[in-house]
């Protein structure tokens, strides 16, 4: 049966709660200063300690990993992410693993980063390091991991068997037109990730920022937008 997906948005950052036959999967965890709001959303959906099977982080930025350590402790769950972003969450160093000069660092991103006040970040070590193509069926989630570097080295996507792609911060949809995210560390890697996505059966793209959009927007302009 189709898995129920709940979009949770606070401060322009998306988390996704997926209800499966055996419990819940949380994709990304939002900003630390939105923790109380996030917990209320989880509770209202029926997610509680004992039935949150897994937290999956699309990458290691503070606005996506900000509540992971807390939720792991409270809900008795595990955290999964790609190893190539591990230093970001273990050290709380948001420059870790990035180029000295990222390929795309737009003024819109700089303004947004200036105004965001994330709150205290609890560093942590992930329980599971996922790899490209890895199935998440053992957690009751009919989905597979896609390594989608570009925004960061360890960025991943999650593609369900129903064609829902959680793409993290590779793409966004903040101004009504989906496109490449405003911060891209490695543009060549991002282009390769877009090409990879084009070859897959995707129905809906669910980004880390902005509203979900149909897969028809994944075109060459998305990857080559400067």
Per-segment meaning from a language model:
Residues 1-45, 157-168:
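Conserved beta-strand hairpin/beta-sheet module of binuclear metal-dependent hydrolase folds
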Residues 52, 76-82, 166-169, 183, ...:
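Short hydrophobic/aromatic-enriched beta-strand-loop microsegments
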Residues 35, 43-128:
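Active-site HxH/HxHxD metal-binding segment of metal-dependent hydrolases
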Residues 12, 22, 31-32, 62, ...:
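Short, glycine/acidic-enriched loop or turn micro-motifs at the edges of active sites
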Residues 128-137:
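Short internal loop-to-helix segment that lines adenine-nucleotide cofactor pockets
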Residues 32-33, 119-121, 135, 141-220:
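Metallo-beta-lactamase
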Residues 95-102, 184-185, 223-225:
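Short, hinge-like loop/turn segments at secondary-structure boundaries
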Residues 25-27, 56, 79, 164-166, ...:
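Residue-level marker for buried hydrophobic side chains located in beta-strands
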């Amino acid at each position: 049966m189709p898995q129920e997906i709940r979009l949770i948005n606070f401060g322009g950052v998306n988390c996704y709660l997926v209800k499966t036959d055996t419990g819940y999967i949380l994709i990304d965890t939002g900003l630390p200063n939105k923790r109380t709001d996030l917990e209320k959303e989880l509770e209202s959906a029926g997610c509680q300690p004992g039935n949150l099977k897994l937290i999956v982080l699309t990458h290691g930025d503070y606005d996506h990993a900000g509540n992971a350590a807390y939720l792991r402790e409270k809900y008795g769950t595990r955290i999964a992410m790609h190893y190539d972003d591990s230093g970001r969450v273990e050290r709380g160093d948001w420059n870790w693993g990035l180029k000295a000069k990222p390929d795309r660092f737009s003024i819109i991103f700089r303004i947004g980063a200036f105004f965001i006040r994330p709150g205290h970040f609890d560093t942590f070590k992930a329980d599971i390091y996922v790899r490209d193509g890895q199935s998440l069926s053992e957690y009751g989630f009919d989905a597979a991991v896609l390594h989608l570097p570009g925004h960061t080295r360890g960025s991943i996507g999650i593609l369900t068997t129903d064609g829902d792609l959680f793409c993290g911060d590779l793409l966004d949809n903040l101004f009504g037109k989906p496109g490449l995210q405003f911060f891209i560390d490695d543009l060549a890697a991002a282009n390769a990730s877009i090409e990879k996505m084009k070859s897959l059966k995707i129905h809906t793209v669910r980004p880390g920022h902005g509203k979900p959009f149909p897969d028809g927007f994944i075109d060459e302009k998305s990857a080559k937008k400067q």
